[in-house]
Amino acid sequence: MRNLSFIVLFLLTLFFIHHLVDASLLVKSLPGFEGPLPFELETGYVSIGESGDVELFYYFVKSERNPENDPLMIWLTGGPGCSSICGLLFANGPLAFKGDEYNGTVPPLELTSFSWTKVANILYLEAPAGSGYSYAKTRRAFESSDTKQMHQIDQFLRSWFVKHPEFISNPFYVGGDSYSGKIVPGAVQQISLGNEKGLTPLINIQGYVLGNPVTDKNIETNYRVPFAHGMGLISDELFESLERSCGGKFFNVDPSNARCSNNLQAYDHCMSEIYSEHILLRNCKVDYVLADTPNIRTDRRRVMKEFSVNDSSSLPPPSCFTYRYFLSAFWANDENVRRALGVKKEVGKWNRCNSQNIPYTFEIFNAVPYHVNNSLKGFRSLIYSGDHDSMVPFSSTQAWIRALNYSIVDDWRPWMMSSNQVAGYTRTYANKMTFATIKGGGHTAEYTPDQCSLMFRRWIDGEPL
């Protein structure tokens, strides 16, 4: 009887674990892409939370080189609340939109030459619930926060590895960009602590990758003014007056300091028409792609009506970098696309970024302590910055890295493309942290994909940049 009870319990446990990750699908083709996919793509849901009330959606792309032995990385898009389609189709995945003008059909896709999946297995996760195709079954489960995300990522991974045991021994990394600068280092720490507590399966965590990482809002805000001056966006006189009147502090300014406030208003005026994610690019308005996306089966006139615009000139032209955001709204909401990806019927309309609709608590105001703890554990890290990003200036990232106070093992130098052209600049520290700038890059990798792909390939293979 005791043996029978044990067998029943064992079978129930296997059934429960299988149920957590049973909604997976091998995707052989996608609407918008001609022919079968030339890479292996799996999508699915993993149930997490106390009662399995959170359903996190993922895209898993196997490495094109040697998936059995190549590293595995989970990629977390910033936001919080932005879809991982941003990573898969905009940043470092194997597909991208062609950028043709929208004609009412499914936007066409094409292969990229710069995918990070050429050398690594990548798991693109839609987190927290409410991001992309992920959802929650109850209002309470829908609530999220910085620390809750970290715990859920750890829980997701251990459930996912149960279903994919062949990848347990692969070197594992956590990657992300923008607001994920707050989440990724904490998730690495959470995974490490889980391993130490004996949580199974053990995750072979080796390090993390961060692009243009939001780390400390005060530091980032403080470095925007000198960045703007260095880029010629404000005058010497205004910069010097800002330095004097504000005492070099440009955040939490004393409202009684009228001179500082007036100077900051002048600074804001100079920056108001600059595209902050990449100061050299055309400032295309993209507010409409952040709100509810339009009905797919509609003509151009109806599209403009739903976007509350009067003429086609109010829509971004295909030459605009952000036009791909417009296309993603139509692609991701197409019924055939959702069916091909295995999206559950409970999921409503897809938004590229759904931040305003997620009940989210911001708890981490400074992520530097997580970097300190991860350095003490001996984890590798790659931190990179586009040098034309004014949202999270590369100089602000350099500042908190210097504050870690680790000795330099490879000092500031250019790193080169294969064509012997300068791709950016790099420095490596004794805590196994590599910092790199991306020449001409913005917020984030998607603006200079060839350089970022080469940087990642060298770093993940243990080569110097």
UniProtKB/Swiss-Prot annotation:
State which tissues express it.
Answer: Expressed in roots and flowers, and at lower levels in young leaves and seedlings. Expressed in mature seeds and detected in expanding siliques.
Show which residues constitute the signal peptide: 1-23
Q: What does this protein do?
A: Involved in plants secondary metabolism. Functions as acyltransferase to form the sinapate ester sinapoylcholine also known as sinapine. Able to convert in vitro benzoylglucose into benzoylcholine.
Q: What happens when the gene is disrupted?
A: Plants accumulate sinapoylglucose and contain low levels of sinapoylcholine and increased levels of choline. Decreased levels of both benzoylated and sinapoylated glucosinolates.
Glycan-modified residues: 103, 310, 373, 405
- Annotated control of activity: Slightly inhibited by phenylmethylsulfonyl fluoride (PMSF).
* Pro-peptide region(s): 292-317
GO MF, one example: sinapoyltransferase activity
Q: List the disulfide bonds.
A: 82-353, 246-260, 284-320
Query: Quick one: a GO cellular component term?
Result: extracellular region
Pfam families to which the protein is assigned, alphabetical: Peptidase_S10
EC number(s) on record?
A: 2.3.1.91
Question: In which compartments does the protein localize?
Answer: Secreted
Which protein are we looking at? Serine carboxypeptidase-like 19
Q: Please give a single GO biological process term from the UniProt record.
A: proteolysis
What is the protein's quaternary organization? Heterodimer.
Q: Which keywords has UniProt assigned to this entry?
A: Acyltransferase, Disulfide bond, Glycoprotein, Secreted, Signal, Transferase
Q: Which family does it belong to?
A: Belongs to the peptidase S10 family.
Q: Which residues form the active site?
A: 178, 389, 443
What InterPro entries does its record include? AB_hydrolase_fold, Peptidase_S10
Does this UniProt record's set of keywords contain Secreted?
yes
Q: How is it modified after translation?
A: N-glycosylated.
**Major location, coarse class?**
secreted
Keyword Transcription regulation (UniProt): no
